[in-house]
């Protein structure tokens, strides 16, 4: 069966002055998959994410989403596409002056044009969806633990019921138990909501636990994008060190010993 690509990146080039980060980069995200994007420092993982979601205009190349080329759409058409994105930034990016409920309600008021009361009722539903108690909604971001901030930001990313969820280092700063719980939450939401997930990470446990495919950024392009087993077998120095070094071996052993998902 042919896989449906919900995102198609072709010939992407990103430059900052004389420095080139991406050259002729190609990558697909298939419907329903969790795609992990990895690479060494400076390979432009977050730049790629920003280029796809419309926060950065690439110097060259195209980004097609649901069969439409973003750069060719007018502002209204592009807005309709981007409403189908949910984005979780590395540090949550919650507004410090708003309560958690107000943070989640904001896109519902701004984009879905709900009343404040309706938006805040729906925000409480989103809180429950990510495993946070209702009382969390009355708190400010500064009153939350790191794990709670991640979940609150995830609830906001899910506010408009997106088709594609973008995650930028979602387990960064979490302890191992919190990171494992967050990984399982992503899988549960993917299956329950029919999400496609674009996941930038350096967390080997996440790669082994929840990713269907892995894309490795290297040499200014996607060096390989395939299943973990095939990626780990690629004859490349960085890949071999990353997947077969001490941390990689530990992550593989933990995954091998974990109960299999149904």
Question: What would you call each of these model-derived segments?
Answer:
Residues 69, 117-135:
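Conserved ABC ATPase "signature" region
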């Amino acid at each position: 069966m042919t896989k449906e690509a919900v995102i198609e990146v072709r010939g992407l080039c990103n430059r900052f002055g004389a420095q080139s980060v991406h050259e002729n980069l190609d990558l697909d995200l298939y419907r329903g998959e969790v795609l992990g994007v990895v690479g060494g420092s400076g390979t432009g993982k977050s730049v790629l994410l920003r280029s796809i979601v419309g926060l950065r205009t690439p110097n060259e190349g195209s980004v097609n989403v649901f069969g439409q080329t973003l750069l060719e759409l007018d502002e209204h058409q592009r807005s309709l596409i981007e409403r189908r994105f949910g984005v979780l930034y590395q540090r949550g990016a919650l507004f410090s002056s708003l309560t958690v409920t107000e943070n989640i309600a904001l896109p519902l008021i701004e984009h879905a044009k709900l009343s404040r009361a309706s938006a805040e009722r729906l925000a409480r539903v989103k809180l429950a969806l990510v495993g946070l108690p209702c009382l969390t909604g009355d708190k400010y971001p500064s009153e939350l633990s790191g794990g709670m901030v991640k979940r609150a930001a995830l609830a906001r990313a899910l506010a408009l019921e997106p088709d594609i969820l973008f995650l930028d280092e979602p387990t960064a700063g979490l302890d191992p138990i919190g990171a494992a719980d967050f990984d399982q939450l992503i899988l549960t939401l993917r299956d329950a909501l029919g999400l496609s997930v674009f996941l930038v990470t350096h967390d080997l446990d996440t790669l082994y636990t929840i990713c269907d495919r892995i894309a490795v950024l290297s040499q200014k392009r996607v060096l390989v994008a395939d299943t973990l087993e095939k990626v780990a077998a690629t004859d490349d120095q960085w890949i071999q060190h990353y997947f077969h070094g001490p941390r990689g071996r530990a992550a593989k052993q933990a995954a091998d010993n974990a109960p299999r998902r149904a």
